[in-house]
């Protein structure tokens, strides 16, 4: 009887390496697949692709599996990076890892793996898949400190039915122990924290290679000009560092934060104090929705939600089509609203709002706007909250 073939996405890191070893130990026919998805600066100081491939080959030799490299750079640029730039140009702050998972790791990679006669694919993500009553559920990882279900919330039933997450039941500390015990050459390699497939580099410098600067005024909520920004695309909601107001004599001495953008006037609004009302939101609207089960929760469903990675689930109520918030948008896309029990800090357009029912990840959408802590005011990528000077 032939062994079941599993193709493992191997990055050269510890997690995917241990994933491949675990599956080999469990008796699977394991094939490693290294994805090359970025080519713009292969010889640059921040590109680790060459060393990552060397690490993959070394690990494959040690555990005794075949490995190959596949180039998805064109797919990545078309499906992920182009959207990444469009979102930043529109003043939003996208999460490319979410789109990369849906379009590259679990679409282009999955398709290629199936062409290699694989029954399943596996990655080193910290999450779990559970089959129940003929349906597949995406669950949080056993190690909640490493849970990556937030980045995987756009996976559908077809993708989950072919996916294994061997590390979902294992704490990260144990993964490191396994790597050391079996003598993996990359056992002490640090975890990657850079943009998906682009690596760790000064982000503003990287973005400026593709988007031009466009200076404009930096204002307070009452309309006072306190500085100049280099371009709205280079700032994100809640940002504190890199604003350029650290030595400013304006204000009360509290730290400054980015609070809103007005695309029409090219104005960046900043506020002082971590808990300023312009930074706090109890409601949001999200579009470009995706549900793991293929359908949304019931209107009025009480759930938890994350508006950024590693955030604790925030209690909220889901508003579907019955509330009017999920009505079709300009492009015919569904929307949903979330009403939170407690105010959320710096809810950022372009980021994902991901819903949970306990351990189960339900799916989510891309944040379009959020109501601020001040009644009747909201902030989106293109509009600041109602200004004091306009009252």
From Swiss-Prot:
Residues 146-148, 308-309 are annotated as: Interaction with tRNA. Keywords: ATP-binding, Cytoplasm, Disulfide bond, Nucleotide-binding, RNA-binding, Transferase, tRNA processing, tRNA-binding. ATP binds at residues 9-16, 35, 124. It catalyses: S-sulfanyl-L-cysteinyl-[protein] + uridine(34) in tRNA + AH2 + ATP = 2-thiouridine(34) in tRNA + L-cysteinyl-[protein] + A + AMP + diphosphate + H(+). InterPro entries: MnmA-like (IPR004506), MnmA-like_C (IPR046885), MnmA-like_central (IPR046884), MnmA-like_central_sf (IPR023382), Rossmann-like_a/b/a_fold (IPR014729). Pfam families: tRNA_Me_trans, tRNA_Me_trans_C, tRNA_Me_trans_M. Gene3D superfamilies: Adenine nucleotide alpha hydrolases-like domains, HUPs, Translation factors. It is an enzyme of class 2 (transferase). It comes from the Bacteria. Residues 95-97 are annotated as: Interaction with target base in tRNA. The record marks 125, 351 as: Interaction with tRNA. The keyword Metal-binding does not apply. The active site is at 100 (nucleophile), 196 (cysteine persulfide intermediate). Disulfide bonds join 100-196. GO terms for cellular component: cytoplasm. GO terms for biological process: tRNA wobble position uridine thiolation. SUPFAM superfamilies: Adenine nucleotide alpha hydrolases-like. It is found in: Cytoplasm. The keyword Lipoprotein does not apply. Its EC number is 2.8.1.13. One of its GO terms (molecular function) is tRNA binding. CDD domains: MnmA_TRMU-like (cd01998). Belongs to the MnmA/TRMU family. HAMAP family: tRNA_thiouridyl_MnmA (MF_00144). Catalyzes the 2-thiolation of uridine at the wobble position (U34) of tRNA, leading to the formation of s(2)U34. This is tRNA-specific 2-thiouridylase MnmA. It comes from Burkholderia orbicola (strain MC0-3).
